Amino acid sequence: MEKERIELRLDYVLNSGKKTGKSYESILKLIAETFGVQLTTTIHNRNISYYLIAITSPAKLAILINYLNEYSLFTSKYLNFQDFSNCVNMMLNKEHLTISGREKITILKESMNNKRTYGII
């Protein structure tokens, strides 16, 4: 039987600010250093440069979740965070190793970001 791999990562992507003339690079470097990861730059649509912080370590994800539980996000970002937090907790509890756990994670993932069909009222 082929083993399915589930990867859980949280990427924060922010426009590098070339249009506004304001850069978030210094604060984003501090955030990246806090989590022991690199601040990288990526190019997206129309050659727009974005900063990227990617956190994959379960221990570091748990720290981030604790922080965001105390200092909440707003709008659909909050809903995406709730789903993401549920996925992290499932993985920390090894639920992702079961068929039902993988199915639940897939359902949560499929409802995130632009696929979300509901919002905060």
Swiss-Prot record:
SUPFAM superfamilies referenced in this protein's UniProt entry, alphabetically: Homing endonucleases
A Pfam match: LAGLIDADG_1
GO cellular component: mitochondrion
Gene Ontology molecular-function annotations: endonuclease activity
Entry's localization field: Mitochondrion
E.C. designation(s): 3.1.-.-
Keywords of the record: Endonuclease, Hydrolase, Intron homing, Mitochondrion, Nuclease
Main location: mitochondrion
Disulfide bond annotation, renumbered to this chain: none
InterPro entries on file: Homing_endonucl, LAGLIDADG_dom, LAGLIDADG_Endonuclease
Gene Ontology BP terms: intron homing
Domain of life, per lineage: Eukaryota
Family: Belongs to the LAGLIDADG endonuclease family.
Function, in words: Mitochondrial DNA endonuclease involved in intron homing.
Further remark: Encoded within intron 1 of COX1.
Protein name: Probable intron-encoded DNA endonuclease aI1
Provenance organism: Mycosarcoma maydis (Corn smut fungus)
Encoding gene, per UniProt annotation: aI1
